[in-house]
Amino acid sequence: MLYELVAYGIAQGTAEKVVSLINAGLTVGSIISILGGVTVGLSGVFTAVKAAIAKQGIKKAIQL
């Protein structure tokens, strides 16, 4: 479950950055921007984990 959240968060954040890069045209900064997308994705993972904790209770979330 946790790995799925991580993969989803990274994919979503990276996809958003890739789309914006394609629209802006690929440059040397594109690599940095894609890495930024991974960071955004990880923050999305933390949000999802917080939601899981709130929804299922701390004990269940720790078992993830």
UniProtKB/Swiss-Prot annotation:
InterPro entries recorded for this chain?
A: Bacteriocin_AS48, Circ_bacteriocin
Keyword Nucleotide-binding listed? The answer is: no
Cross-link Cyclopeptide (Leu-Leu): residue positions: L5-L64
Write down the Pfam families for this protein, in alphabetical order.
Bacteriocin_IId
Give the main localization category.
secreted
Q: Which residues form the signal peptide?
A: none
Compartments it resides in? Secreted
Domain of life, per UniProt, equals: Bacteria
Keywords of the record, alphabetical order, are: Antibiotic, Antimicrobial, Bacteriocin, Secreted
Pro-sequence residue ranges: 1-4
Recount the entry's temperature dependence annotation.
Answer: Displays a high degree of stability when incubated at temperatures between -80 and 75 degrees Celsius for 60 minutes. Autoclaving the peptide at 121 degrees Celsius for 15 minutes had no effect but incubation at 100 degrees Celsius for 60 minutes caused a 32-fold reduction in activity.
Share an example GO biological-process annotation for this protein: defense response to Gram-positive bacterium
What Gene Ontology cellular-component terms does the record carry? extracellular region
pH influence on activity = Stable from pH 2 to 12.
Functional summary from the UniProt entry = Cyclopeptide antibiotic that inhibits the growth of Gram-positive bacteria, but has no effect on the growth of Gram-negative bacteria.
Q: Identify this protein by name.
A: Carnocyclin-A
**What is the protein's species of origin?**
Carnobacterium maltaromaticum
